[in-house]
């Protein structure tokens, strides 16, 4: 909801799709591939970036990304790691797949 409000207040036209799914590598990969094939501009995912056995989001995204953008997530880890040390354990990733920007947020 926050993302939708932010973009609508900036006067941009956006279409936001929310999907809640289990920690399933094949299901996540299929969804991301479908969105990339549709030339979606930006994909944000939340969760699944930690070091637990079910945290698979960065691993799936790495298979799809053509170019990684490491600085974005490094900045987020440093900024929030000072206040929330567990943020430093995040394996968040950002990159480009075709024409689509992908961000795996904690």
Where are these regions (language model features)?
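Non-catalytic beta/alpha edge segments that cap or flank active sites
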Residues: 1-106
